[in-house]
């Protein structure tokens, strides 16, 4: 794998690969496979040793917002398959703990927990494991999509709210939170509690996020445990 300054792929795409439709392959599956084969980020992730193209999203967000500092403690919610955990380790975090309901293959240097981050004792458990509270809580989680935009939007907002309230318990003063949301209007309901507890709140859509996708990332920095009183 290349070093911490790995950059996303640039330049024109290569030859477009088209797949013949197999009898047992659905149209949606056919479309997904064709897109994967022609996605430069998928190819670059494989070539550079990242477990998913999503690694480039965190690389871009970190380059822009300075989320991962040397020696920091990082929690990766919904860590599978481990791409964001890899990036955090490669960029100098001292302690990285990934949590997911699914099993995740080991990432050198990181601790991976198969469990539910929403368990009441999880923030305290992770704080004890890391030797202190986190400097960054990050989430690239998304619920299973239904194809109905409004439903999918509300589902990810609810999931991100859970991640945000986890971060309130898990973050050290001055810490940061980054999470994926889908655009659709209701993401604004996240802003008020975030503005109460963080010094700055921004939205960003990395270049590696597919143009047709409604996903964007909310980035909050300067955590204030006591809200505006701090």
Curated annotation (Swiss-Prot):
Annotated family: Belongs to the class I-like SAM-binding methyltransferase superfamily. RNA methyltransferase RlmE family.
Catalytic reactions of this protein: uridine(2552) in 23S rRNA + S-adenosyl-L-methionine = 2'-O-methyluridine(2552) in 23S rRNA + S-adenosyl-L-homocysteine + H(+)
Location in or out of the cell: Cytoplasm
Active site, UniProt feature: 180 (proton acceptor)
Entry keyword annotation includes Lipoprotein: no
Protein residues bound to S-adenosyl-L-methionine: 82, 84, 100, 116, 140
EC number: 2.1.1.166
GO terms for cellular component: cytoplasm
Keywords, ordered alphabetically: Cytoplasm, Methyltransferase, rRNA processing, S-adenosyl-L-methionine, Transferase
GO molecular-function term, one example from the UniProt record: rRNA (uridine-2'-O-)-methyltransferase activity
Function field: Specifically methylates the uridine in position 2552 of 23S rRNA at the 2'-O position of the ribose in the fully assembled 50S ribosomal subunit.
Native source species: Granulibacter bethesdensis (strain ATCC BAA-1260 / CGDNIH1)
Protein name: Ribosomal RNA large subunit methyltransferase E
InterPro entries: RNA_methyltr_RlmE, RNA_MeTrfase_FtsJ_dom, rRNA-MeTfrase_E, SAM-dependent_MTases_sf
Residue ranges the record marks as coiled coil: none
SUPFAM superfamilies, A to Z: S-adenosyl-L-methionine-dependent methyltransferases (SSF53335)
Keyword Heme among record annotations: no
């Amino acid at each position: 794998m290349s070093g911490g300054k790995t950059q996303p792929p640039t330049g024109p795409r290569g030859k477009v690969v088209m797949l013949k439709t197999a009898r047992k392959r659905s149209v949606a599956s056919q479309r997904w496979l064709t897109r994967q084969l022609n996605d430069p980020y998928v190819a670059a992730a494989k070539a550079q040793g990242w477990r998913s193209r999503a690694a480039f999203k965190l690389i871009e967000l970190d380059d822009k917002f300075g989320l991962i500092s040397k020696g920091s403690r990082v929690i990766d919610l919904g860590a599978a398959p481990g791409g964001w955990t890899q990036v955090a380790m490669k960029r100098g975090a001292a302690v990285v703990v990934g949590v997911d309901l699914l099993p995740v293959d080991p990432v050198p240097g990181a601790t991976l927990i198969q469990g539910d981050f929403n368990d009441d004792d999880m923030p305290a458990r992770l704080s004890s494991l890391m030797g202190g509270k986190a400097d960054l809580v990050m989430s690239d989680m998304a619920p299973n999509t239904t194809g109905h935009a409004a439903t999918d939007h509300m589902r990810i907002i609810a999931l991100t709210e859970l991640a945000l309230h986890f971060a309130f318990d898990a973050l050290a003063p001055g810490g940061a939170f980054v999470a994926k949301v889908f655009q659709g209007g209701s993401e604004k309901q996240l802003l008020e509690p975030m503005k109460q507890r963080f010094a700055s709140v921004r939205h960003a859509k990395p270049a590696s996020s597919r143009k047709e996708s409604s996903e964007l990332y909310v980035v909050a920095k300067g955590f204030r445990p006591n809200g505006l009183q701090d």
